[in-house]
């Protein structure tokens, strides 16, 4: 990472590299050769942003952001098949211009997103169910708006719109509202708000891998469109230590991707994608406590309702979640973090009857069970540049199913050193 703060501009850069090797271990046959189920993802991500500092009122400021990424998988072990691997590169260029006049902030956002995904050799067939894929996708985003702060900063109105032009197999333009309204009453103790938005969500191999690394490297990738996302809620801060929030979300999700077990190419230890449209309702409540920057406590509870068009369930997604996080900072030397994640009501799609399987809408549904995952992190900061940490994951040693046929490790311990220059 690199940062520099100058009088007229601020520059930040970030470069990350990840090499993740693993096995597709979700097998029913334990005697499979490990090399045949090995995989490795290589990821490179470079980011940079520059922001002008020409003053607040009566000055035009610009923030430009550039994000580049590359993702690649291993080649098959057979030399003649070395080209049958996945490669993906993409970038996101975004420019935000703003001008403040009195209580009004005029802004316009212009963005360009590109994703190029390829697998194997284009127009070639390896097997009847495995062929070469090349998909190039570009999305142009335009988002102008006005943000006004009125009534002694109590009323905030952010009104604009967003146009996304999706250059895929067919060029399509989408129009989304971008409206936010809130009113702060009782010295910010009670802040009701409403939001109306939408988005064209660009899908990628990188994004699917980060959700589920056990996916096939050859995928049919389609973008997700959210025509609307309505939020109604209330939030506030009490006595400067306590914060709370309650919000209801109503989201229309078209072309949402779900992970299901592949039965065509793999032996059932990899996942492919099915797409469906749904109405998603989410209700979330949160509570926070902060004391003198030493103790922080956050508690979040969520409930989800999914109304799908074709699939019987929203595969792998929870119906309820409970998240608890706490941290304590002692003399800025010792930092203790504890977390607890719980998920309930997850289901997987299977293709036959069996133990734990029910039938719904002519589809077979497997109950994945509950997730109860606790973690603990201990960090010692020698100075501002050098620190060390130990992290314990799944300290309750629960062998819950992360995905179908994929139980997690009972407990894992990580440690490391951090150096800043």
Segments predicted by a language model, with ranges:
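Surface-exposed extracellular loop regions of Gram-negative outer-membrane beta-barrel proteins
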Residues: 1, 106-120, 133-166, 292-305
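Edge/loop elements at the starts and ends of beta-strands within beta-rich repeat scaffolds
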Residues: 6, 55-61, 100-105, 150-155, ...
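Short acidic, glycine/serine/threonine-rich loops at helix termini
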Residues: 26, 119-122, 204-209
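Beta-strand-dominated lipid-handling architectures at cellular/organellar boundaries
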Residues: 75-92, 96-98, 103-113, 120-138, ...
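Short structured motifs
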Residues: 92-94, 142-143, 230, 373
């Amino acid at each position: 990472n690199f940062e520099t703060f100058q009088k007229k501009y601020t520059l930040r850069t970030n470069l990350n590299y990840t090499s993740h090797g693993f096995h597709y271990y979700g097998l029913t046959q334990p005697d499979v050769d490990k090399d045949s189920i090995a995989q490795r993802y290589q990821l490179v991500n470079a980011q940079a942003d520059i922001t002008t500092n020409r003053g607040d009122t009566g000055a035009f400021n610009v923030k430009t952001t550039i994000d580049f990424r590359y993702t690649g998988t291993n080649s098959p072990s057979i030399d003649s098949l070395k080209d049958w691997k996945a490669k993906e590169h993409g970038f996101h260029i975004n420019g935000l211009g703003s001008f403040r006049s009195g209580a009004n902030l005029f802004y316009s956002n212009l963005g360009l997103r590109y994703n190029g995904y390829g697998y194997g050799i284009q127009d070639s067939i390896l097997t009847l169910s495995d062929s070469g894929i090349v998909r190039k996708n570009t999305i142009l985003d335009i988002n102008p708006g006005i943000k006004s702060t009125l009534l002694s900063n109590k009323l905030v109105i952010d009104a604009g719109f967003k146009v996304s032009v999706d250059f895929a197999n067919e060029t399509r333009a989408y129009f989304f509202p971008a409206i936010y309204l809130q009113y702060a009453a009782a010295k910010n103790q009670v802040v009701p708000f409403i939001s109306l938005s939408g988005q064209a969500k660009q899908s990628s191999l990188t994004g699917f891998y980060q959700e589920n690394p056990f996916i096939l490297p050859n995928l049919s990738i389609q973008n997700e469109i959210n025509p609307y996302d309505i939020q109604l809620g209330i939030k506030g801060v009490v006595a400067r230590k306590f914060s709370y929030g309650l919000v209801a979300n109503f989201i229309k999700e078209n072309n949402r991707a779900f992970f299901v077990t592949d039965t065509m190419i793999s032996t059932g230890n990899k996942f492919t994608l099915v797409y469906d449209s749904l109405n998603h309702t989410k209700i979330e409540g949160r509570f926070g406590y902060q004391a003198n920057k030493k103790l922080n406590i956050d508690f979040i509870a969520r409930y989800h309702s999914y109304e799908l068009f074709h699939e019987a369930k929203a595969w792998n997604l929870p119906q309820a979640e409970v998240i608890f996080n706490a941290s304590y900072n002692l003399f800025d030397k010792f930092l203790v973090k504890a977390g607890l994640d719980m998920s309930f009501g997850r289901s997987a799609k299977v293709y036959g009857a069996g133990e734990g399987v029910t039938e719904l809408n002519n589809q077979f549904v497997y109950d994945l069970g509950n997730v109860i995952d606790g973690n603990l992190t201990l960090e010692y900061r020698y100075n501002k540049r050098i620190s060390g940490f130990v992290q314990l994951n799944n300290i309750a040693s629960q062998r819950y199913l992360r995905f179908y046929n994929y139980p997690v490790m009972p407990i894992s311990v990580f440690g490391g050193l951090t150096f800043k220059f």
